[in-house]
A protein has these predicted regions:
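Short, Lys/Arg-enriched N-terminal segments with co-localized hydrophobic residues
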Residues: 1-15
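Bacterial N-terminal signal peptides that target proteins for export
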Residues: 15-28
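Bacterial Sec-dependent N-terminal signal peptides
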Residues: 33-87
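Aromatic-Pro/Gly-enriched surface loop or interdomain linker
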Residues: 68, 72-178, 356, 364
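Catalytic beta-strand/loop cores that center a nucleophilic Ser/Cys/Thr
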Residues: 88-101, 239-326
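Structural recognition of the beta-strand scaffold that forms the well-ordered cores
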Residues: 114-119, 162-164, 179-185, 211, ...
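A glycine-rich, often tryptophan-bearing local segment used as a flexible ligand/cofactor-contacting loop or short
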Residues: 187-267
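A short acidic/glycine-rich loop-to-helix N-cap element
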Residues: 333-348
Length: 369
């Protein structure tokens, strides 16, 4: 039977009342009772004897304290998570050469072998790009669109379908149809939607989500002069940006890593370009090629001191789920023409084609040695 509330209250108060009746403990109370009985007189003493109260046993002796020791007791701690050096806290992405930074979310393996060339410029336009193109997808090319036409020719010869545009709205809406997006010297705020009078950042969002799905990005030459005010894009370039360059001059390119994109490219070949100086300098990437700075005359272009110890010109990385293959080379028209008359044109075109194919996932990407 459940006791009443009053009974519960009484039970809860009982220990407190008992404690208040004998504040000095049971043992002292028993001794007092015996003393009072003794004071009451023999057979005729006054007052009845107090009831018997049991004497509480003496407390057991406490154990001796432990002997002093020099041993420092272990301090319990939370388990420490392993630090993942593939995560870049500055750009808030997983990036580098570890394939775990790749997300196979976009079903790009079943996507047709198709790439999109994006060559819109929002700043000084390189001569190799020619006259700006009309809006839309695959507008008519002009005879001076040398870089775009050269890329179409080179990649089509590999069985790759190539589309092209300088329309930022087309890029934002169609980007997921391609295994790789090629930024062909597209520069400055090339993804700013103010170019098409929109108020939303659709192109940037589309590129970021495309990379996170496992897309491929190829940046050529002045793609390093784009989106200076968007840190995500700087990270996509490998933590690098164009700062300045010296005269357009000859130098020797050296392949520094074995990779599917450098396969069968001579370990050293002559080339002519602007040899971009970079700020910041790329990090957490796989360097593929450099320029031998001893062959550059002059080396520097004030105020940048140049990269005398190591001047990279091509590299690759996984970035935020996708693949990024990058080169600062590609300034001159003769590097893209079919007659291969330019110094180093054969080697350069082979390097670019193989870089695009690796970014598409057609060959192994950015392999570690």
């Amino acid at each position: 039977v459940r006791p009443s509330d009053s009974a519960i209250d009484h039970q809860e108060e009982t220990p407190l009342k008992h404690s208040r009746s004998f504040p000095f403990g049971l043992a002292s109370a028993a001794a007092l009772a015996l003393a009072l009985t003794a004071c009451g007189g023999g057979d005729g003493g006054g007052g009845a004897a107090l009831p018997f109260l049991p004497v509480a046993p003496a407390p057991a002796a406490s154990a001796p304290p432990p002997a002093p020791t020099d041993e420092v007791p272990a301090t319990p701690t939370e388990p420490v998570a392993e630090v993942d050096d593939s995560f870049d806290e500055y750009y808030n992405v997983c990036r580098g050469t570890n394939p775990k930074c790749y997300n196979d979310w976009g079903a790009f393996a079943t996507t047709p072998d198709r790439v999109l060339i994006y060559s819109r410029t929002a700043g000084p336009r390189h001569a190799v790009l020619g006259t700006p193109m009309a809006a839309g997808l695959n507008p008519a090319m002009n005879t001076d669109n040398v870089m775009q036409a050269g890329l179409v020719r080179m990649l089509s010869a590999e069985g790759i379908t190539v589309d092209w545009t300088e329309d930022v709205a087309v890029l934002g809406s169609r980007i997921n149809n391609y295994k790789a997006i090629i930024f062909a010297s597209s520069n400055r705020d090339t993804l700013w939607n103010g170019a098409v009078s929109t108020s939303q950042d659709a192109a940037r969002t589309a590129l970021r989500n495309y990379m996170r799905r496992g897309g491929g990005f190829v940046g050529l030459h002045n793609a390093f002069g784009a989106e200076y005010n968007w840190p995500y894009y700087e990270g996509l370039l490998g933590n690098a940006n164009f700062y300045n360059h010296g005269p357009n001059r000859a130098g020797d390119v050296e392949i520094v890593s074995d990779d599917p994109s450098t396969k069968d490219v001579p370990k050293r070949f002559s080339f002519q370009d602007e040899w971009y100086n970079l700020m910041p300098f790329p990090t957490k990437v796989k360097f593929l090629a450099k320029v031998d700075t001893s062959t550059l005359k002059p080396l520097t272009s004030a105020p940048h001191p140049g990269h005398a110890d190591f001047h990279p010109v091509a590299w690759c990385q996984y970035y935020d789920g996708g693949r990024a293959w990058l080169t600062t080379l590609g300034h001159n028209a003769h590097s893209f023409t079919a007659d291969l008359s330019g110094v180093g044109a054969i080697e350069f075109q082979k390097l670019v084609v193989q870089g695009v194919k690796s970014a598409m996932g057609l060959t192994p990407f950015c392999t570690t040695e």
